[in-house]
């Protein structure tokens, strides 16, 4: 039996950054683990995550996920962490070096696309992205509407 990839199985999908592909050209993706505390992983499993304004950076040879909101766990006490704290990403050194090289280009950033649970561990799918201009967004919307119109016409035949 073929092994399912993380993109085929959406049962464990926690959060998805839907605006990312609208606002950016995503050229490459990489999967990274997250260092979370106990109450944070409970909030993640409860789907209380917002990736919208998040981004990742490489500092001192370590990758960090920033500005991702993981809500406080309802039943947590003083163990709850700051919802917007920086979280360390677990990547191999080769992957970090590859990202550092790619991030040297002007206008390239690292954004979270999806967060999911894989084999009991929280993972985040990061995308190497370059920002779109307004005319690129309009062109994509126009192309999408044309495809819908073609599908609608073809459906009747």
From Swiss-Prot:
Subcellular location: Cytoplasm
Keyword RNA-binding: yes
Keywords carried by this UniProt record: Cytoplasm, RNA-binding
An annotated GO BP: trans-translation
Family matches, as Pfam families: SmpB
Family: Belongs to the SmpB family.
HAMAP family, per database record: SmpB
This protein's name: SsrA-binding protein
Gene expressing this chain: smpB
């Amino acid at each position: 039996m073929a092994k399912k990839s993380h993109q085929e199985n959406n049962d464990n999908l926690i959060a998805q950054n839907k605006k990312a592909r609208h606002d950016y050209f995503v050229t490459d993706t990489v999967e990274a683990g997250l260092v979370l505390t106990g109450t944070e992983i409970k909030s993640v499993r409860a789907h209380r995550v917002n990736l919208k304004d998040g981004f990742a950076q490489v500092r001192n040879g370590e990758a960090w996920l920033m500005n991702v909101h993981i809500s406080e766990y309802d039943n947590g006490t003083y163990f709850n962490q700051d919802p917007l704290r920086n979280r360390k990403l677990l990547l191999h050194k080769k992957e970090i070096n590859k990202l550092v090289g790619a991030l040297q280009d002007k206008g390239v950033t690292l954004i979270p696309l999806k967060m999911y649970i894989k084999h009991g561990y929280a993972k985040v799918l990061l995308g190497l992205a370059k920002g779109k201009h307004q005319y690129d967004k309009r062109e994509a919307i126009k192309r999408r509407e044309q495809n819908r119109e073609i599908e609608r016409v073809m459906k009747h035949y």
